[in-house]
Amino acid sequence: MRKSIFLAAALLSMMPYMADAQGTEINSRDHRGDVVYQDDEVVFRQLDEHTWIGNGHRVYNESLYLVEGNDRAILIDAGTIIPELDKIVAKITSKPVTMMLTHAHGDHVGGVGPFPEVYLNAGDMPIVPNSMRNYQGQIKYLNDGQVIDLGGREIEVIFTPGHTAGSITFFDKAKHYGFSGDAFGSTNLLVFTNLSTEMYSAERIENYMKKHDIYYLFPGHYSGDNLETLQRVTDIKNMCREVLDGERKPTASNGNSGGMDMMVDDKGVRINFSSRSGMK
């Protein structure tokens, strides 16, 4: 699905350098590290000793994340067109890799083919027949609050509908970051459900980030300087609420953002939604 993603630099609310739980310094201006694999369709860079960021070249830096524990690894999202993605990640980690999705849009599921099973939230099953029509493996479900034990590293699944009905965000609380897919937009948020649902998810993640001291979220279209911060999530919550309460008037858009005809644009983020689906 074509998306109009405006890769404006996000204003990060954290300090110029932030240490992870192991004390590794990470440059907040660009968390993408050294290149460990590159071909015509994807480039993988190392974030820390056990985490890698992949960027596809088809739809505005569509991003995938390889997250490794002592016993196994998960691959979060699969890009748009990445042939033999299983063989690519096998060059990066020797651990068995399980494919998991933040949501089922075409620019996040394109490389799932070689994986024998794929995990996602059941809320996105209505779009799977279109976006994953050729997938022959098993589809399994991830539930809100589910904890994935990778061996010495745990990843928690939190339900964040809004962009799609089944969007989820993955959190590594020990490292103080998460992987949010398109739930908060990569600076250009497309709400395919409604604003009430998006506001609910933003408020929930705002509280989660405060409670667990989450520094930032790696988005689904990461360009190196557009991390999602607590402030960004709070701004999205407030902008949705203001539209719903009549305090902020949306403007008409040209419909190029996923066919959506309304938008609000402020604080470095654009929220696109459809008047046909209703705001509530």
Can you say where each PLM-predicted feature lies in the sequence?
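Metallo-beta-lactamase
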Residues: 73, 80-81, 156-159, 165-243
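Ser/Thr-glycine-rich phosphate-binding loops at phosphate-binding pockets of nucleotides
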Residues: 100-103, 121, 160, 164, ...
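Conserved beta-strand hairpin/beta-sheet module of binuclear metal-dependent hydrolase folds
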Residues: 38-91, 169-182
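Sec-dependent N-terminal signal peptides
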Residues: 4-14
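Short, hydrophobic/aromatic-rich segments at coil-to-beta transitions
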Residues: 47-53, 145, 154-156
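Active-site HxH/HxHxD metal-binding segment of metal-dependent hydrolases
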Residues: 81-151, 242-245
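Accessory terminal helices/loops
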Residues: 15, 19-35, 203, 207-280
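Short, basic/low-complexity N-terminal boundary segments at the transition from targeting/disordered tails
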Residues: 22-46, 123-130
